[in-house]
């Protein structure tokens, strides 16, 4: 197994560990939103780790970015649910906020790494 694949595997395991830990620290009502937000963050983080070089700084950035999924789920779950469309709106906001936040985080990390 090459060193890059080992770093990639380590990063994915750490990201999944952050998801499991966050699931138990999230409130009972926010767990579905947390899992949705974590899934979006996980997909973006794995894609960024695969495309970019899997160095220690990028692994730290991915873990930091994955930790933000808890904040996104709290924000999305705090929106009121009055009609059936509001539930779809909360899911849409959760997906979009997770994607944008993760993208901005990776842009910032990439900018720090390239100088």
Curated annotation (Swiss-Prot):
Origin superkingdom: Bacteria
Subcellular location: Cell membrane
InterPro entries the record matches: Conjugal_tfr_repressor_TrbA
Segments traversing the membrane: 5-25, 39-59, 60-80, 91-111
Membrane topology qualifier: Multi-pass membrane protein
GO cellular component: plasma membrane
Keyword Cytoplasm included in the entry's annotation: no
UniProt keyword annotations, A-Z: Cell membrane, Conjugation, Membrane, Plasmid, Transmembrane, Transmembrane helix
Primary localization class, coarse: membrane
Protein name per the record: Protein TrbA
Gene label: trbA
């Amino acid at each position: 197994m090459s060193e890059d694949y080992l770093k990639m595997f380590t990063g994915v395991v750490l990201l999944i560990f952050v998801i499991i830990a966050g699931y138990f620290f999230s409130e009972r009502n926010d767990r579905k939103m947390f899992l949705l937000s974590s899934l979006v963050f996980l997909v973006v983080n794995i894609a960024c780790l695969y495309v970019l070089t899997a160095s220690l700084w990028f692994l730290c950035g991915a873990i930091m970015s994955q930790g933000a999924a808890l904040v996104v789920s709290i924000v999305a779950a705090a929106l009121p649910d009055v009609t059936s469309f509001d539930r779809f709106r909360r899911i849409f906001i959760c997906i979009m906020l997770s994607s944008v936040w993760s993208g901005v985080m990776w842009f910032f990390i990439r900018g720090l790494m390239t100088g």
